[in-house]
Amino acid sequence: MFILNAIAAFGNWFWGLPILFLIVGGGIYITFRLGFVQFRHFGYICSQTFGKMFAKTGDDEISSFSVACTALASSIGASNIVGVPVAIAMGGPGAIFWVWLIALIGCATKYTEVALGVKYREKNEDGEWVGGPFYYLRGLGGGIGKFLGGFYAIGLMIELIPSLAAQGLSATSQFAIFGVNQVIVGVIIGVLIVLVVAGGLKRIGKVMDIMVPVMAVVYMVGAFIVIFANIGNLIPAIVSIFKYAFAPHAAVGGFAGSTIALALRWGAARGVYSNEAGFGTAPAAHSSADVDHPIRQACWGVFEVTVDTLIVCTVTALAVLASGVWTSEKYEAGALAQAAFNNVFGAFGDYFVAICVFLFVFSTLIACVYYGQRQAEFLFGVKFAKIWRWIYVVFMVVATTGIDLTMMYMITDGFLAAIMIPNMIGCIVLVGQIAELQKEYFNTPGKYYLADVEAKKAKKAAK
């Protein structure tokens, strides 16, 4: 118990100023080294991602969109519905400004992670592409690279145990509203997860290709209805985000008030948690893509952060702020999104939010089990990894019988801190290699970026 408390205490400390120095400072450095690529080439990035979501690929190929959906399944979770309102409740409307800023900086970090994942990927025993921090950290060279790679793999493999337990409880608890036994639901979910993951990334990709876009669109349609029902408060809500990012907010109703420091702290933490830039998890999925260059796949890293944080989180924030529920004394921080939907949809709002949270968390569980399996494979081989995924399911089902959810999240925070440190060190030190790859991608005549530009011109001329 002492060890778990120590891990939780470390996580609580880390998610203050240290996270700002590491993620924000590191992200700014990476942004400068890459020449502000997420801004300078944003139009091109959109054309290669949003513009090619439904591009056809070969039967045996794993498309960039499929792996992006798998990575999005991990980042689009309960945090998008529950975490964002908590940031508002604790840090005021200004917290959302810092969520956005972290996302803009995080685009470069995620871009770097994905590019490194593809650059350093290898073929496993089954002939599949595998990669992630546990591979690219070895690019640091010598014993330190091997140590950090192994440390990351062990850390994430263990971190996913409390994370999956907490996420599993979040998913099954949504069925309480329907009067269904949580343990039975947990067992069913566990079996479904293993059936999906057992098919490898191809099967996961096929499921996520449908599930992620549908659940995101359904949720956003509902949130937009809430926003339009409170359209008169939309502009004041947007103004408050910018105003209170740089000014304290006085207490009002059930809101206890906030300072600039609180807005920054909660906005930064939620921003990082939401898009997972700096975690190093997404490259495990992206490394499997059939793609001609690491930078082409890196564009999907920017796509992920844009969808997860700049779109989905923003819609949640505006729904909560415009509805005014965040200042009410009747609701707890974690129930603000549900309250906003209830004000418009009535009792149906409870069911709508419960279903959305379940779908978001279920997709996250699938992605996380896959990530954990990859760590186990790196450390102990393919056979052990196939057994290890069942260990995750067992812990998830046991969690449905009742666990201290707060402690699980605190332990998760501690382990996340431990794995983010080596991953960010790797990204910062190795970003020079990505800068070189970027030059190759954007400047090689007749290939990659320039070939795409010429193809676009030819298409226009043909019209």
Q: Which residues does each predicted region cover?
A:
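Transmembrane helix-loop junctions in multi-pass membrane proteins
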Residues: 2-3, 33-38, 79-84, 160-174, ...
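Flexible loop linkers connecting adjacent transmembrane helices
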Residues: 36-63, 86-96, 108-143, 326-344, ...
